[in-house]
Amino acid sequence: AZLGFZGFVMSDWAAHHAGVSGALAGLBMGSMPGBVBYBSGTSYWGTNLTISLWVNGTVPZWR
């Protein structure tokens, strides 16, 4: 709410390229779910962000 906006922030189709730093900057949702590269099994918002939130505490729960 630094700028007074209290709504939901969502990226454009595959426009985000970071998980933790994007979440900490205020991104609430990436618009295109799925893998970073086709059928790679890795994603910016999937497992890595979950680990950062629940396992190592990199992303605070309030974010």
Curated annotation (Swiss-Prot):
Catalytic activity: Hydrolysis of terminal, non-reducing beta-D-glucosyl residues with release of beta-D-glucose
Residues linked to a glycan: 48, 56
Active site: residue positions: 12
Enzyme type, top EC level: hydrolase
GO biological process: cellulose catabolic process
Key words of the record: Carbohydrate metabolism, Cellulose degradation, Glycoprotein, Glycosidase, Hydrolase, Polysaccharide degradation
EC number: 3.2.1.21
Pathway per the UniProt entry: Glycan metabolism; cellulose degradation
A single MF term (Gene Ontology): beta-glucosidase activity
Family recorded in the similarity comment: Belongs to the glycosyl hydrolase 3 family.
Protein name: Beta-glucosidase A-3
Upper taxonomic lineage: Eukaryota, Fungi, Dikarya, Ascomycota, Pezizomycotina
